[in-house]
Regions:
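Short glycine/proline- and aromatic-enriched beta-strand/turn motifs that initiate or cap beta-hairpins
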Residues: 20-73, 239-241
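Transmembrane beta-strands of outer-membrane beta-barrel pores
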Residues: 34-42, 68-74, 86-88, 101-107, ...
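Predominantly the C-terminal beta-signal and adjacent terminal strand-loop region
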Residues: 191-242
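Repeated loop/turn-to-beta-strand initiation elements of outer-membrane beta-barrel proteins
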Residues: 30-32, 60-66, 89-97, 125-131, ...
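Outer-membrane beta-barrel architecture
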Residues: 53, 81-87, 117-121, 161-165, ...
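Residues that define the transmembrane beta-barrel architecture of outer-membrane proteins
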Residues: 44-50, 74-80, 110-116, 125, ...
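Detector for outer-membrane/organellar transmembrane beta-barrel domains
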Residues: 115-186
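Cleavable N-terminal export/targeting peptides
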Residues: 1-29, 242
Length: 242
């Protein structure tokens, strides 16, 4: 616990960088992403909700993003992300450095979760790789018998994501399909042994809007307490350059 402030300070100093899934088209510095989702598993039933994210391409190699999610009285989430492209090859492959901060609130449990993460990413023609570390606080726990409140700190959890795409993901395609294996998504970071497996699909409209869908399985339970794969989720949304 005594090293916690220093750890988060290092994350902040190492950041000022943001993360965008794909470069924003020229002339469109802002990109709005919205999706609805349905999530169900045996342990906690079903829930629905939606999310909005806004990305700002502040410079050719720098992007800043904000986002919020609401999940039918189960959780409310917000995040701030930042990414810099630190290397671009002749084939347009990119090496990025990403910093993100995630806040989640669970009203029924009176819990709040704060997570800071730092990642590197590699974007190639058909494969995207991400690897990083995060620190997590879980605060405002249920009062103990002595009337006090506690805080749980989880240092240095590993984050990873591997995505494979049918078409070259570095250039525009009318459609694309892919597979993803990771322990996190936009507003959830699981422990490294709790994995998400999903299939993704993208379709581009003439006005540069992209429709997308993602369906997969994921660990069940709340706050990373179990890892049995009997749950599934569905995301449906669109990405619109502004």
């Amino acid at each position: 616990m005594k090293h916690t402030p220093l750890t988060f300070l290092l994350l902040i100093l190492a950041s000022s960088f943001a993360f965008c899934q794909e470069p924003t088209p020229k002339g469109h510095p802002l990109t709005l992403t919205g999706y609805g989702f349905y999530d169900t598993h045996y342990a906690s039933g079903s829930l629905g909700g939606g999310a909005l994210m806004l990305d700002w391409q502040a410079a050719p190699a720098f992007c800043l993003g904000i986002g919020a999610e609401y999940a039918s009285s189960n959780r409310i989430s917000a995040r701030l992300t930042g990414q810099a492209t630190i290397l671009t090859t002749l084939l347009q492959q990119r090496l990025t450095l990403e910093n993100s901060y995630l806040w989640r609130h669970f009203p029924a449990l009176n819990l709040q979760e704060f997570t800071g993460a730092l990642q590197i990413g590699w974007y190639a023609r058909h494969l995207n790789l991400h690897l990083g570390l995060c620190n997590r606080y879980i605060a405002e726990l249920v009062q103990r018998n002595n009337g006090g409140q506690g805080t749980v700190f989880e240092p240095m959890n590993v984050m990873f994501a591997i995505e494979g795409w049918w078409h070259n993901s570095l250039v525009p395609n009318q459609w694309n399909i892919g597979l993803r294996w990771s322990n996190y998504n936009d507003f959830i970071i699981e422990r490294v042994a709790n994995w998400f497996f999903s299939a993704k699909a993208l379709y581009s409209l003439p006005d540069s809007t992209r429709l997308y869908a993602e369906a997969g399985i994921h660990p069940v339970g709340s706050l990373n307490l179990t890892a049995s794969y009997d749950g599934w989720f569905l995301h449906l949304g669109a990405v619109k350059p502004l």
